[in-house]
Amino acid sequence: CLYLSLELSAWYMHRRNMQIVSGLDKEQVTDNYEEIYNLHKDKLNHIVIQTIAPNLDQIQQKIRELQPAVVVVDYIDLISTNGRYMGEYEQVKQVSHYLSNLAVNMDIIIIQISQVSRSYSREERLDLYAGKGSGAIENASRKVIGLNGQANNDTKEVSMLKNTDGELFDTELVWQPSFRLRRT
């Protein structure tokens, strides 16, 4: 798995992954980092985290180099594009379509993560059009999954907002201090 974490540090992402595989909270992982890593390294060694914002060609080059089965891009609006004067929508459209084509041509899964636009965030609602550049994302994607919830409430809702080969659904989950989400 190649994880392009363009907002959070590699250590932060690594610690979160250790929390998930161990079921422990942040303090427990931080206090016993080496022991926990040694217990779970077989579940973590396949994850490569890159924190430098690449352009589209560099993403393709890294995929060719590592041959991952899954690529996660967190967030797509932080990917550099070649267009100097593109608006936000055009930039997201270029990135989303490029990554979609890469997924098809290289036979891999690419998960594109997008932030919610301000208006949807203020209204505390989530639908297919809530993401920044959502029309472009929806157009280039075979599946769109939304994760909705407020910081002060551990209950979150996962919704399949688009699914070209299956059903749509909503399910409630509870966030755990280990960053796991458990179905309620």
Question: Whereabouts are the PLM-identified features?
Answer:
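Cytosolic-facing regulatory segments adjacent to core modules
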Residues: C1-A69, T81, G131, T171-E172
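Generic enzyme active-site microenvironment
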Residues: S5, V72, I113, A140
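Flexible beta-alpha connector loops of hexameric P-loop NTPases
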Residues: E27, V48-Q50, S80-K93, R122-Y129
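C-terminal regions of RecA-like/P-loop NTPase motor modules
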Residues: K26-Q28, D57-V71, N101-M106, R118-T184
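Conserved H-loop
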Residues: L6-L8, I108, Q112-Q115
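A structural motif corresponding to the C-terminal end of an alpha-helix
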Residues: K41-V48, L99-I110, A140-R142
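Alpha-helical scaffold elements adjacent to nucleotide-binding pockets in ATP/GTP-utilizing enzyme cores
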Residues: M13-I20, Y98, A136, A140
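Helical hairpin unit composed of two closely spaced alpha helices linked by a short loop
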Residues: A69-Q112
